[in-house]
Amino acid sequence: MNNVPNVEKQIGIDLYTTKTPGIGGKLRQQTEDFGVIEITNREEGTEGKYLILELTKRNWETHHLIRDLTRILRISQKRVGFAGTKDKRAVTTQKISIYDMEEEALQNVHLKDTELKILGRSNKSLELGDLTGNEFIITVRDIDLDEKELESRLSQTTASIKEQGGVPNFFGIQRFGALRPITHVVGESIVRNDIEKAAMAYIAASYPDEPEDTQEVRNRVFETKDYIEGLKGYPLQLRYERAMMHHLVSKPEDYAGSFETLPANIRKMFVHAYQSYIYNTIICSRIKKGLPLNRAVVGDIVCFKNKAGLPDKSRNERVTEDNIDGMNNLVKRNRAFVTAPLVGYSSELASGVPGEIEREVIEELNVPIEGFKVPSMEELSSKGLRREILLSTDPKYFIEEDELNEGKYRVTLDFSLPKGSYATTILREYMKVEPLKMS
């Protein structure tokens, strides 16, 4: 029996779907151990007002690189398009577009740990919708098993994933915070309209994996609400907590206003994380009650494949006794996908046994459905939608001696996932370790 780490249980994940022992190991001992190659549905030509480039970067945050690139080219950042941001602590390859740019201008670009390759031209910029997925090439190091046992565990886990048709499409620990999984806790308080509790949780709730001095100053602020002391003691890298405390120094009761100091994408992350926690819990409950992920049952709601080959969450249909065979034929061919709810104030829930599971979880967690209309911060309101519950993937693995850790082995895993999915959902089934070792 493989014990799931407590931190994963806190985010709604309390099981593995593979029964094999984990291989252990560590990720990201060096930047090159984590590779991401963007998959798009674009084909570039030779004419057009946009220059299309392939950008390979090492240890760069995407927005920072675009900022530095546009400074060198002396152009506005608005002229650069890309389909998605990529991990910083990784070697990543993606397309970018630059409006009204000649190839010769790139001769002046010399940025550390980057490579730009001209692919062609287009009359269409790179946009978020162009991303269909990512290929991950990830090295797990410091594996303390003999080669025969390692091969056995890898082959059994891979066979199990193939037999299941993939792995659960969980929201990974990054959605919640690897060091401090707090975002869904904050989101729950927002949905319950306890904005003070939400603000204090984000600013001052401490977690055991944080540095001890950070835990201590958070605890003091939590007890005293002395934000001036907090600003003196909080490390500068905790810039979002510091921004909220700056606001509360001048307006001590304006907790909603303190959230307004955060970037819009960070504010939205809280309610999204709460929805993700409920969703993870529903998938685990479905598995424990013996319902499949790779096949629909009566009462399920499925969505259909769009032109890009991705789930179209706006096209849903309920599974009935009359259409179940046809639906499962589509599911088997990856043209339809079984879904679970990201709960909101206008959620469409399944019926039959899947619907019972969804309603049981919502009741057990005492989810206030109407609370997803957030009157104090309307932009955080969410109607809800449904998301596919299975990640179809076909991992490949390679075993080699680990040159960084004498007497140990390293395994390179190669797999592709659709956009919006988490590589850790695959890695956790192989490694079965604490999430911090995967971050």
UniProtKB/Swiss-Prot annotation:
Superkingdom of origin organism: Archaea
InterPro entries, alphabetized: PsdUridine_synth_cat_dom_sf (IPR020103), PsdUridine_synth_TruD (IPR001656), PsdUridine_synth_TruD_CS (IPR020119), PsdUridine_synth_TruD_insert (IPR011760), TruD_catalytic (IPR042214)
Catalytic reaction annotation: uridine(13) in tRNA = pseudouridine(13) in tRNA
Active site: 87 (nucleophile)
A GO BP entry: tRNA pseudouridine synthesis
EC numbers, comma separated: 5.4.99.27
Keywords of this entry: Isomerase, tRNA processing
GO molecular function: RNA binding; tRNA pseudouridine(13) synthase activity
Pfam annotation, one family: TruD
Functional description taken from the UniProt entry: Could be responsible for synthesis of pseudouridine from uracil-13 in transfer RNAs.
Protein family: Belongs to the pseudouridine synthase TruD family.
NCBIfam families attached to this UniProt entry: tRNA_TruD_broad
Xref: PANTHER family: PSEUDOURIDYLATE SYNTHASE PUS7L, TRNA PSEUDOURIDINE SYNTHASE D
Protein name according to UniProt: Probable tRNA pseudouridine synthase D
Annotated source species: Methanococcoides burtonii (strain DSM 6242 / NBRC 107633 / OCM 468 / ACE-M)
